[in-house]
Amino acid sequence: MSGNDLTNDRVQAHETLIGVGNVATLKPAWTFKTLGSVSATPLVTGGYVYFPDWGGGLHKLNARTGQVAWSRKVSEYTGWRDSVSRTTPVLSDGILVVGQQPQSFGAKHDSSYLPGPETGDFLWKVMLDQHPATIQSQSPVVYNGVIYIGTSSNEEHWALDTKFQCCSFVASMAAVELKTGRVIWQTPMVPKGYTGGAIWSSTPAVDPKRGVVYITTGNNYTTPPEVAECGERQARLPACQ
């Protein structure tokens, strides 16, 4: 998974070969021509590398040789021409979980979709938000048969169009059943009357002992009028919090 494990520590404790003394001497073992730039952290497991690119591709390569096991377009799974993924896939119980987003203005919404890792064949997809600006930029995590993933938005970019009526998107965090795609729960990230609160970064951290999922949010768009008015009167004072 993107953060290495459930704690999202991003530490490879078993890596002993690469260090400050030899990193400058490293040379490519193999290369692979993608359909676009790659910004997602690759998933490396079972001798294979899984990753998406900004050209709309999703790939599985042999980690040692770079040989292509399979390479698909994200649009094959979603049915939407401009679909891309910027999230690190996660593999659990023989199922590959990937989040996606549209590239074009006014395109379709977010969804999580699941290819089978051996062939890349489609299994199921789930749409977590009907808002047209919704995307998924957070990489999912799977624990105990449940996918944890949040929603983000392109609405602040859409607002560059002066004709666009911003803002109405409300972010949420969801728990989805891995085998079926059934949404177990979904929680909004901002109180009623607010908009924004996108979950756009990294991967959730899961604490199995406490039964808690840790996430970060950002990009608040709007606040209720009474809160905004209070803020103007009492700028930076606790009275408005």
What are these regions, as identified by a protein language model?
Residues 73-80, 126-131, 183-197:
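Surface-exposed loop and turn segments in beta-propeller and other repeat-based domains
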Residues 23-24, 62-65, 116-119, 177-180:
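Short loop/turn segments that connect beta-strands within beta-propeller blades
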Residues 27-29, 67-71, 121-125, 184-185:
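A structural motif specific to WD40 beta-propellers
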Residues 33, 62-65, 73, 127, ...:
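Short clusters of small/polar residues that mark proteolytic maturation junctions
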Residues 1-6, 35-57, 80-112, 132-165, ...:
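Repeat-blade elements of multi-bladed beta-propeller folds
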Residues 18-21, 53-69, 73-74:
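Beta-propeller domains
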Residues 10-14, 55, 62-63, 226:
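Short, glycine/acidic-enriched capping/hinge loops at junctions between secondary-structure elements
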Residues 1-28:
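Blade/loop signatures of beta-propeller domains
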